[in-house]
Amino acid sequence: MTIKANRRYLITPDLQIPLHHPKAVSNLIKMSKHEKFDFVLNVGDELDMTSQSRWVKGTKTEFAETLHDERSIAQDILFDLGTTDIIRSNHTDRLFTTLLKGAPSLLGLPELVFEKFMAYSDLGIRFHKRAYEFERGFFLAHGDEGVMSKHAGITALNLAKKWGNSVVCGHTHRQGATRHQTGLNGRYSTIWGIEAGHLMDMKNKASYLKYASADWNMGF
């Protein structure tokens, strides 16, 4: 890997389109265009894929036929953000899971592979199926690769300790950065766990949240 000095990254949080907060996403796009980052990394869950969820099985939501429109919205937003890299995630895994459980004979179709389904190559986006080392010692992950903590930053830090490298992730919908340092004979090493938060509209769109309440952190 070639490391360039002063390389700047934007980490975009869980959007979960169409449950995203339009104004917050608009502000993120404006900031991305103004700052002209070298790379724009997305931690996954760019789509909520609500109708593919096991929680709506047998309900009218499963038959809503909204996925095409949701995909188009996501493609537009990701393009406007200047997204360069996206990691796999549990919500976008729902496409594969739906096919596996309901129509396994379609699994061989290349157009139903998620990154092709989203036309990411046409958008100039690299899709990563495994944790991606975007800078030496720093990995982009979704956050569901380990055990989730209720404390911001700790899910990422636990992954960092497990992998021996700093980790930036989403999934928890919390924002936080925490570090772990080891040392011996005056030689120290530090790894970071960073969680990116979310940009969902909890009040108006996340109807599954009772009283629109959750210990999450909206922002970027």
Predicted regions and their residues:
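Core catalytic region of metal-dependent phosphoesterases/phosphodiesterases
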Residues: 8, 12-121
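Short, well-ordered loop/turn elements at secondary-structure boundaries
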Residues: 5, 36, 134-135, 161-164
